[in-house]
């Protein structure tokens, strides 16, 4: 491992929920996923991860992991995204990741349209569009405490307060 890579690993160890040995295992997994050896994972490579491939929100996951919007996920972004799913990841970190799933334009709010689009990805054609829109409208109305027509992170946090988000967003077997 060169000095630059060693420095990157030290930084990742400080800023993620992973130990040095866990980061080494993640690096090996990342390199296996990076089929073309480009140093980053594109959408097709990302969808080879079993826990993500079967998720109806797989494309949202890619967008969240891809912090810089380059269309690919480098190792640091990979670690950053997975860190929220670590058993060492706290409630706030998991809530922030979940919020990002819905905040498609990254403006810090979940709009009616964003909530609709994400829920549509989750339910597919199991609900009629009109039924889904009614659920979205009711959710926004009930959770939107300041009446601005959208959900802030704080409002989102209150809305999901009764759920066990820590358990639901922890992947025991990341390696």
UniProtKB/Swiss-Prot annotation:
Ca(2+) 4 binds at residues 144, 146, 148, 150, 155. GO terms for cellular component: calcineurin complex. InterPro entries: EF-hand-dom_pair (IPR011992), EF_Hand_1_Ca_BS (IPR018247), EF_hand_dom (IPR002048). Residues 21-56, 60-88, 90-125, 131-166 form the EF-hand domain. PANTHER family: PROTEIN PHOSPATASE 3 REGULATORY SUBUNIT B ALPHA ISOFORM TYPE 1 (PTHR45942). Keywords: Calcium, Metal-binding, Repeat, Virulence. This is Calcineurin subunit B. Ca(2+) 3 binds at residues 103, 105, 107, 109, 114. This protein has four functional calcium-binding sites. Belongs to the calcineurin regulatory subunit family. Regulatory subunit of calcineurin, a calcium-dependent, calmodulin stimulated protein phosphatase. Confers calcium sensitivity. Plays a central role in virulence and antifungal drug action. Ca(2+) 1 binds at residues 34, 36, 38, 40, 45. Ca(2+) 2 binds at residues 66, 68, 70, 72, 77. The keyword Repeat applies. One of its GO terms (molecular function) is calcium-dependent protein serine/threonine phosphatase activity. The gene is CNB1. CDD domains: EFh (cd00051). SMART domains: EFh (SM00054). It comes from the Eukaryota.
